[in-house]
């Protein structure tokens, strides 16, 4: 990884993990409002057995563990052992004894039928290889009438994305995302997430779109570095940027983000989709 602000980013896995550790406090602060929104939407109760899919570095699993109490339990599941270790460290720091991690694929869950009272995923379901299969597999491990609750990104056309990745796209053209690759906006179209939940056998399906706070507690330089570090779906586009264009892109990103900044924090706002269904 290079630290020069006008250089092309290094897209190695280690770089992303270093960035996750470097920005963990501020990233958690930025994501707190969407975590809170999903937790409130899910309505966890004391004693519940909860499964959080694509849990990454630990949210909303850690917040859910605080809500279900000592007689409840939360399992944080993800493909990345490294991110789950970050989640486990965060849970230990909070002395949560009702929290465990599980490295596994959401398409093949290592749990018996009827294991969980509640399932959640924050910004994860968009990246399932086969959402229908994953949702059916999740339904298998839910108990009768248990609820699955998801939060996904709304459209690309919103300040957080347009002010940074939109600037890059205007420079390089071509596809914003790699065809067939990970798509953060897979369920941005109204009704698309609820439709696939119904197809997977869920009942009482609901969906709504909300605009929530999405605020970075620091300067433009930080949020731009953090965005590049975690922007895996945009990597093919970012790799098309010629080396000599990066200084101009950095300048234009700063100009695009500045209207949302008060000098201490950057208030983008986030358009998200909340959806749920019952077994």
Describe the predicted segments one by one.
Residues 2-48, 59-63, 67, 86, ...:
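Conserved class I S-adenosyl-L-methionine
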Residues 117-131, 154:
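A short SAM/SAH-binding and catalytic strip from SAM-dependent methyltransferases
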Residues 3-4, 8-15, 30, 57-59, ...:
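Conserved Class I S-adenosyl-L-methionine
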């Amino acid at each position: 990884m290079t630290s020069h602000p006008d250089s092309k980013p290094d897209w190695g896995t280690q770089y992303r993990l270093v960035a996750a550790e470097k920005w963990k406090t501020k990233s958690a602060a930025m994501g707190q409002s969407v975590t809170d929104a999903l937790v409130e939407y899910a309505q966890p109760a004391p004693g519940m057995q909860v499964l959080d899919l694509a849990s990454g570095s630990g949210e909303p699993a850690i917040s859910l563990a605080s809500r279900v109490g000592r007689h409840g339990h939360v399992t944080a599941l993800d493909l990345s052992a490294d991110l789950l270790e970050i989640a486990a460290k965060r849970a230990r720091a909070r002395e949560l004894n009702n929290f465990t991690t599980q490295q596994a694929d959401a398409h093949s869950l290592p749990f018996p039928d009827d294991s969980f009272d509640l399932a959640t995923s924050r910004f994860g379901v968009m990246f399932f290889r086969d959402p229908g299969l994953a949702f059916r597999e999740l339904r298998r491990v839910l108990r009768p009438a248990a609820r699955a609750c998801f939060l996904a990104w709304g459209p690309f056309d919103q300040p957080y994305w347009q002010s940074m990745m939109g600037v890059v796209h205007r420079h390089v053209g071509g596809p914003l995302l790699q065809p067939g690759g990970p798509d953060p906006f897979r369920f941005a179209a109204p009704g698309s997430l609820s439709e696939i939940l119904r197809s997977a056998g869920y009942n009482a399906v609901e969906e709504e779109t909300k605009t929530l706070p999405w605020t970075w507690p620091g300067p433009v330089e930080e949020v731009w570095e953090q965005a590049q570090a975690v922007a895996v779906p945009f990597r093919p586009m970012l790799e098309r940027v010629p080396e000599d264009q990066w200084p101009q892109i950095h300048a234009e990103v700063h100009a695009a983000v500045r209207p949302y900044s008060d000098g201490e924090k950057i208030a983008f706002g986030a358009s998200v989709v909340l959806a749920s269904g019952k077994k």
